[in-house]
């Protein structure tokens, strides 16, 4: 089983959705964890509501620091925000394959409740597309360089490109 670590700076929205999707769609093939480099101390209620709308359990998520996972050997690290992508990861993550899957922060969307829900749904859909593409790969047997290249390509997919 591969351990996958989803990192975001604030650790309240995107990483929760990413972790939930990886664990749900991974069907025991992978174990996903998530944390933040500078966690804000709470999970965004919009992220939890999005999981609930998709029948994924919203319970058990905490705003955690990446320091809380030092004892778990990570195989793949996925950053989902640009700030986290530019940060230096802790030494314990140095052997992991790193990739960046930039996603706009739905927690920063201003507007009506419908517009906010739409932003979270778009985030969910984009992360779901990328996770599905990743899980279609023979992750366990790929060479690190090949896997890194594929994951980087997946990280550039948009929702419109995923329809092709």
Put a short name on every predicted segment.
Residues 36, 81, 102-104:
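Residues at the C-termini of beta-strands that transition into short coil/loop
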Residues 16-18, 44, 87-90, 110:
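Short glycine-/acidic-enriched loop or helix-start segments at secondary-structure transitions
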Residues 58, 84-88:
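Glycine-rich nucleotide phosphate-binding loop and flanking beta-alpha elements
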Residues 33, 76-78, 99-101:
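Hydrophobic/aromatic beta-strand patches that form the interior of the parallel beta-sheet core
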Residues 10-12, 82-85:
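Short glycine-rich anion-binding loops that position phosphate/pyrophosphate groups of nucleotides
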Residues 71-73:
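Alpha-helix C-terminal capping/helix-to-coil transition sites in glycosyltransferase folds
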Residues 1-68:
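Conserved active-site segments centered on acidic
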Residues 88-164:
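Phosphate-binding/catalytic loops
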